[in-house]
Amino acid sequence: MSPLTHSQNSTILPLLIALALSAVTANASQSLPFRLGDEGTITFISPSTATTAGTGNATHMGRITSDGNLTIVGEASCVDNEVGFSVEMQDTFTAANGDKLTTAITMQLCPIAPGIYHGVGTYVVTGGTGRFANATGSGVFDGTGNFNTGTIICALRGTITMNRH
């Protein structure tokens, strides 16, 4: 077997570097399944705005706390001609180590009993801090709010891409 010539080294080395970099790039922006469950409270500041706070668990985060701002932006058409609410929400989920994940949620809230609303919609990851800096992702939102007791429960299910550098 003969040793590689300078010309062969010049061709093979860049190919090996390109392969290594493509593997690192693929790993750096891999889309992963994401699930989050959260329970907490809702406090209305005005007839159309509220804050939320809760605790729960999320994949890639472990135990979390949540803080959100909710705005009713219009009416939603619900089953049996019930009138519900179209809602926009910004929520921040904080992991035990302090890393944060921020989301924008849009949902339709429809009454299921007096003062109790079921919400379905979508979420988009808008960023974060720590390992969630520059994160992206999206999925579905499902939740229930009992405005009589001021309690909420919600779930997010979708994907997240954590851009590791």
What are these regions (language model features)?
Residues L13-A23:
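Bacterial N-terminal signal peptides
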Residues L4, A23-A26:
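Glycine-centered signal
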Residues N27-H165:
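Beta-strand-enriched cores of mature, soluble protein domains
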